[in-house]
Amino acid sequence: MAGGKGKAGKDSGKSKSKVVSRSARAGLQFPVGRIHRFLKQRTTSSGRVGATAAVYSAAILEYLTAEVLELAGNASKDLKVKRITPRHLHLAIRGDEELDTLIKATIAGGGVIPHIHRYLMNKKGAPVPGKPGAPGQGPQ
């Protein structure tokens, strides 16, 4: 029986099915197999990880990535540029309260978030310290 065929060289009726990745089965873009391998490497000595754990982890990572990229895209659109930079990622993460608590890492090239404390701001009508007419600046 050459070539895996049945009687008289005819096909047995079964067509070879294409290999479908676990990412495609789950409807994800992130690689489920690779994440499963990484999870097995990082666990205890037995290296046993459930099959659905990798799918779930890939789905979580994909969701978080999509969320950050959407916010960074909005930040770049607000600044009227077409390319997302580390600065846009930084603004997106620090601008979202939940992502800010989740991601505490320093982003290289992200800069800082502009913030001036309320106490340092001038009140309307109040003289600015150091200028003539400010309290404590008169002749003594």
Curated annotation (Swiss-Prot):
Cross-link Glycyl lysine isopeptide (Lys-Gly) (interchain with G-Cter in ubiquitin), sequence positions: 124
Transmembrane residue ranges: none
Subcellular localization: Nucleus; Chromosome
Keywords in alphabetical order: Acetylation, Chromosome, DNA-binding, Isopeptide bond, Nucleosome core, Nucleus, Ubl conjugation
Origin superkingdom: Eukaryota
Pfam families assigned: Histone, Histone_H2A_C
Disruption phenotype: RNAi-mediated knockdown results in sterility.
Entries under PROSITE patterns matching the protein: HISTONE_H2A
GO cellular component annotations of the record: chromatin; condensed chromosome; nucleosome; nucleus
GO BP annotations listed: heterochromatin formation; negative regulation of cell fate specification; negative regulation of DNA-templated transcription
Post-translational modification: Monoubiquitination of Lys-124 gives a specific tag for epigenetic transcriptional repression. May be acetylated.
SMART domains per the UniProt record, alphabetical: H2A (SM00414)
Tissue: Expressed in somatic gonadal cells.
CDD domains membership: HFD_H2A
Main location (coarse class): nucleus
Chain positions covered by the region annotation Disordered: 1-23
A GO molecular-function descriptor: protein heterodimerization activity
Assembly description: The nucleosome is a histone octamer containing two molecules each of H2A, H2B, H3 and H4 assembled in one H3-H4 heterotetramer and two H2A-H2B heterodimers. The octamer wraps approximately 147 bp of DNA. H2A or its variant H2AV forms a heterodimer with H2B.
Family that this chain belongs to: Belongs to the histone H2A family.
Entry function: Variant histone H2A which replaces conventional H2A in a subset of nucleosomes. Nucleosomes wrap and compact DNA into chromatin, limiting DNA accessibility to the cellular machineries which require DNA as a template. Histones thereby play a central role in transcription regulation, DNA repair, DNA replication and chromosomal stability. DNA accessibility is regulated via a complex set of post-translational modifications of histones, also called histone code, and nucleosome remodeling.
Protein name per the record: Histone H2A.V
Taxonomic path: Eukaryota, Metazoa, Ecdysozoa, Nematoda, Chromadorea
Encoding gene (name): htz-1
